């Protein structure tokens, strides 16, 4: 993975910057880049449809342009990208950074987790609305083809999710060039419309948007629901910071994506000013009829790429949440050795597929899906703005007035969009919100239950001296082997080691008590990844440090000890891990009974520790324990 700090040193003539910028077009800008397929059409529909007047057209496109400027260009590109957690971006990385360095952790964590949960909620809609809006171009080609739109969209989505386990590293190399061609195409089509009606360029003046917003009462307010669709993919600009760095993301945005989007929206507005019908997708009406089918194919490919970015982002965010202790262990499969971000999480993939297909079939068209789309993303952006304000004031040391003025502008814009999108709640907006609440509850329950178990285990801590005294008094036999006892918490002597000695009356002459420590930073320096101290009598205490973007692999880590001259044979190690059986009594302790029951269910279905840490099955002993909560 390229370091952000190194990328910042690149200049415009550096081929690495150009390569990374091209790649960023394929990963970062897929969602926001395909928004022209449905945004302007939705805005005009919310404004009353039919034949809109000049003020409506100019005001609508002006609002879209300035939303792209304020939210995408200023908030995310100019500010958010500068606040990274050791090179990583996104709301979970920002939450971890702030909670690590500041007080008021419960508030920061609550805001960050809710923002992350909301991303999952709207992430189920993005593939559905994107693919449907692309395939709906067939209706312009021939009205009789409208009956094939839904089956084709469903087939594409099923195929997309089905191939995830195989990895997308090979075809992923084409994402950047394809999206570059996509942006060039929509930019040229838009410019063609602008040339036909250059008056539309006046919409760059924000006065048109403000006049329309404040002079049309409820209509001006409701239209913000449609306007917001142009930036639903803006959160990806920040979330993918660690993959590319600030410079390539900015270069791709200002060099191609942003001007192409502006021209396309202006071109669609120009077309409607010329009297084009708003009954069909305005985006496709920019294209000459001879090139309509190739454009539909290109649009479909672009929306598939946008959907792939959403799926990959969900995998990455899930891994972050697991490493930070907010979700149970899930099976993570590395699908390519070429990139750390090439992973697959089956549970997440099939959850997204079922939810996306359900929404696609249930709503049936991009127009109806737009009624449910945006509410969760607008709430996520509010959460990000709250954390940005804290970062500006506490990390950048800006005074509270300056921080408030900058964040206040973003807050006003974000709150306006969120308030407008709340009107979608009954029409389908409740779906992503409900999903977000479920996921947030899962994260809260898992973390709460995990802390409860940790407290109970800590109460039974045994010191090294007392343990050594006991094995000497009881005449425990030491055998020439190496044993590794894994524990998730720092303990002098973990319960599984005590149990092993009591039951077997034998102990290996080399014992490593390995504590897995998940850090609140994305990556741990290789020199700091493994720390080991000998406590005497052949017992070592070791700490394995992993960042929230890293996948633990214990055998590989222990090879470092062998390479450093420690007297251990990696092929002759026996791993001891605890297998807790959690049960609930009708006694109230730190968790309500129903929360406890849900935690027990999640715990039983979590991936076994041996699988998660890549331990060789033939060398693992699981020691069962019952824990009451």
Curated annotation (Swiss-Prot):
<dbReference type="InterPro" id="IPR023051">
    <property type="entry name" value="Kup"/>
</dbReference>
<comment type="function">
    <text>Transport of potassium into the cell. Likely operates as a K(+):H(+) symporter.</text>
</comment>
<dbReference type="GO" id="GO:0015079">
    <property type="term" value="F:potassium ion transmembrane transporter activity"/>
</dbReference>
<keyword id="KW-0633">Potassium transport</keyword>
<dbReference type="InterPro" id="IPR053952">
    <property type="entry name" value="K_trans_C"/>
</dbReference>
<feature type="transmembrane region" description="Helical">
    <location>
        <begin position="143"/>
        <end position="163"/>
    </location>
</feature>
<comment type="similarity">
    <text>Belongs to the HAK/KUP transporter (TC 2.A.72) family.</text>
</comment>
<dbReference type="InterPro" id="IPR003855">
    <property type="entry name" value="K+_transporter"/>
</dbReference>
<dbReference type="GO" id="GO:0005886">
    <property type="term" value="C:plasma membrane"/>
</dbReference>
<feature type="transmembrane region" description="Helical">
    <location>
        <begin position="171"/>
        <end position="191"/>
    </location>
</feature>
<dbReference type="GO" id="GO:0015293">
    <property type="term" value="F:symporter activity"/>
</dbReference>
<keyword id="KW-0769">Symport</keyword>
<feature type="transmembrane region" description="Helical">
    <location>
        <begin position="400"/>
        <end position="420"/>
    </location>
</feature>
<keyword id="KW-0630">Potassium</keyword>
<feature type="transmembrane region" description="Helical">
    <location>
        <begin position="212"/>
        <end position="232"/>
    </location>
</feature>
<keyword id="KW-0812">Transmembrane</keyword>
<feature type="transmembrane region" description="Helical">
    <location>
        <begin position="20"/>
        <end position="40"/>
    </location>
</feature>
<feature type="transmembrane region" description="Helical">
    <location>
        <begin position="372"/>
        <end position="392"/>
    </location>
</feature>
<feature type="transmembrane region" description="Helical">
    <location>
        <begin position="61"/>
        <end position="81"/>
    </location>
</feature>
<feature type="transmembrane region" description="Helical">
    <location>
        <begin position="106"/>
        <end position="126"/>
    </location>
</feature>
<keyword id="KW-0406">Ion transport</keyword>
<dbReference type="InterPro" id="IPR053951">
    <property type="entry name" value="K_trans_N"/>
</dbReference>
<keyword id="KW-0997">Cell inner membrane</keyword>
<feature type="transmembrane region" description="Helical">
    <location>
        <begin position="425"/>
        <end position="445"/>
    </location>
</feature>
<keyword id="KW-1133">Transmembrane helix</keyword>
<keyword id="KW-1003">Cell membrane</keyword>
<protein>
    <recommendedName>
        <fullName>Probable potassium transport system protein Kup 3</fullName>
    </recommendedName>
</protein>
<dbReference type="Pfam" id="PF02705">
    <property type="entry name" value="K_trans"/>
</dbReference>
<feature type="transmembrane region" description="Helical">
    <location>
        <begin position="343"/>
        <end position="363"/>
    </location>
</feature>
<keyword id="KW-0472">Membrane</keyword>
<dbReference type="Pfam" id="PF22776">
    <property type="entry name" value="K_trans_C"/>
</dbReference>
<feature type="transmembrane region" description="Helical">
    <location>
        <begin position="291"/>
        <end position="311"/>
    </location>
</feature>
<feature type="transmembrane region" description="Helical">
    <location>
        <begin position="253"/>
        <end position="273"/>
    </location>
</feature>
<keyword id="KW-0813">Transport</keyword>
